[in-house]
From Swiss-Prot:
Record's keyword terms, sorted: Cell inner membrane, Cell membrane, Lipid biosynthesis, Lipid metabolism, Membrane, Phospholipid biosynthesis, Phospholipid metabolism, Transferase, Transmembrane, Transmembrane helix
Pathway(s) where this gene product acts: Lipid metabolism; phospholipid metabolism
Name of this protein: Glycerol-3-phosphate acyltransferase
Enzyme class at the top of the EC tree: transferase
Organism lineage string: Bacteria, Pseudomonadati, Pseudomonadota, Gammaproteobacteria, Enterobacterales
GO BP terms in the entry: phospholipid biosynthetic process
Reactions listed under catalytic activity: an acyl phosphate + sn-glycerol 3-phosphate = a 1-acyl-sn-glycero-3-phosphate + phosphate
Pfam family, one: G3P_acyltransf
HAMAP family named among the record's database cross-references: PlsY (MF_01043)
Gene: plsY
Complex and partners: Probably interacts with PlsX.
Species annotation: Klebsiella pneumoniae (strain 342)
Transmembrane segments: 4-24, 80-100, 107-127, 130-150, 155-175
Length: 205
């Protein structure tokens, strides 16, 4: 177990470092998401620059690269401490990917995937919080921020032994959203629906 656990942490980081947003955009002939739209290689930005199909592919891949390493670690009987490190490593890989010059995304979908193996009840309330916030506000970033803030409390209620690692994940996500938080405070953040409409407008002319 002593050799398996660190190996899984490293594997999780390498899995997280596979940037699906960049790869999907390359395969679809789309601009590099790091240099287009919001500049973030994630599903929301791919939705803006490439449409729903590409965005769904990125979202699924990003969730799975967080979920599968944690699920594997759980199946091998790793303790909550090591499960937490595996989850954090997957998100760190997504945020600072070794394969893409350490220019990655914000880790929201990957963190959601990493938390999912804890339980369907937790997964459901997390997804509901994220979706409801976006539907009510129109801000994708606010959905991520609210979910990250409330996630440790949800985990403490459902599976308290995972509260600390999930809190670390939340801190990572909040740190990656510091620019979004400032724009939201200044009321300068763009709503996801507004950006999609702007993209469609030239196509309709």
């Amino acid at each position: 177990m002593s050799a398996i656990a660190p190996g899984l942490v490293l594997l999780a980081y390498l899995c997280g470092s596979i940037s699906s947003a960049i790869l999907v955009c390359r395969l679809a002939g789309l601009p590099d998401p790091r240099d287009s739209g919001s500049g973030n290689p994630g599903a929301t930005n791919v939705l803006r620059i490439g449409g729903k199909g590409a965005a769904v592919a990125v979202l699924i891949f990003d969730v799975l690269k967080g979920m599968l390493p944690v699920w594997g670690a759980w199946a091998l009987g790793l303790t909550p401490f090591w499960l937490g490190l595996v989850a954090i490593a997957a998100c760190v890989g997504h945020i600072w990917p070794v394969f893409f010059h350490f220019r990655g995304g914000k880790g929201v979908a990957t963190a959601f995937g990493a938390i999912a193996p804890i339980g369907l009840d937790l997964t459901g309330v997390m997804a509901g919080t994220w979706l409801l916030t976006i539907l009510l506000s129109g801000y994708s970033s606010l959905g991520a921020i609210v979910s990250a803030l409330i996630a440790p409390f949800y985990v403490w209620w459902f599976k308290p032994q995972y509260t600390f690692p999930v809190s670390m994940l939340s801190c990572l996500i909040l740190l990656r959203h510091h620019d979004n938080i400032q724009r939201l405070w200044r009321r300068q953040e763009s709503k996801i629906w507004t950006r999609m409409k702007k993209k469609k407008a030239p196509e309709q002319k």
